[in-house]
């Protein structure tokens, strides 16, 4: 049923099978208490918001009409965990900035970062990446096989890892920051379109790379590239 809420300072310790199956994709369940998933959690239909944090060694799955949302608190997905849900969202619907540390398998169709900090510390893959806020962090490589959209307000990519846009890149956020030693790659043969906003490579070591045979289009008045980082053009600019 829509609007179910689990509240409090206690813990939901799932070692079995936890299923969320609501009437339609717009209905929501909010878990504001802690939740540890060491079994399986399957969001079949609707939105499951995890806002109380937790430590996870189990699996997260989900259907095409479902969203698994890390909406607050500190979540640690250990090396033995897996996220293969269709749609995953990182937000700040609940109190606190929120941090999600992903050290296990991550292979999903769509990833959306609205707020929160998503730390990808192992090789990860998503079909689509949309970042309109928040921070993409971590030490691993996140490979986007479809469209990468960096849009909306201010947002950050940081850490020592790599974000590979291997299916096209659209950049039109207000302030798009690459920090620390993060590298954003426009993959070989792909097209990047920077149509709005300010791109900031803020520190030495932060890199935007346009690979060989890739095309990087800059259009629109007032585009600004700032900072002490590097634009490494190996393709067509």
Residue ranges of model-derived segments:
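Sequence/structural signature of small/polar-enriched beta-strand/turn repeats
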Residues: 1-237
């Amino acid at each position: 049923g829509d609007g179910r809420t689990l509240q409090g300072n206690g813990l939901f310790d799932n070692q079995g099978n936890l299923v969320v199956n609501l009437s339609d994709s717009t209905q929501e369940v909010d878990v504001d208490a802690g939740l540890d998933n060491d079994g399986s959690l399957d969001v079949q239909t609707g939105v499951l918001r995890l806002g109380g944090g937790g430590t996870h060694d189990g699996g997260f799955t989900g259907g095409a009409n479902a969203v698994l949302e890390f909406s607050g608190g500190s979540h640690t997905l250990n090396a033995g965990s897996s996220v293969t849900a269709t749609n995953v969202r990182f937000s700040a619907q609940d109190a606190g900035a929120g941090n999600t540390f992903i050290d296990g398998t991550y292979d999903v169709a769509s990833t959306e970062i609205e707020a929160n900090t998503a730390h990808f510390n192992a090789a990860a893959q998503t079909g689509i990446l949309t970042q309109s806020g928040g921070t993409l962090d971590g030490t691993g490589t996140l490979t986007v096989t479809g469209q990468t959209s960096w849009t909306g307000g201010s947002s950050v990519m940081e850490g020592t890892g790599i974000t590979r846009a291997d299916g096209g890149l659209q950049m039109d956020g207000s302030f798009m920051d690459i920090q620390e030693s993060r590298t954003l790659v426009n993959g070989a043969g792909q097209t990047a379109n920077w149509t709005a906003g300010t791109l900031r490579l803020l520190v030495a070591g932060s890199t935007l790379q346009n690979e060989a045979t890739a095309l990087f289009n800059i259009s629109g008045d007032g585009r600004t590239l700032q900072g002490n980082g590097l634009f490494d053009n190996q393709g067509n600019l």
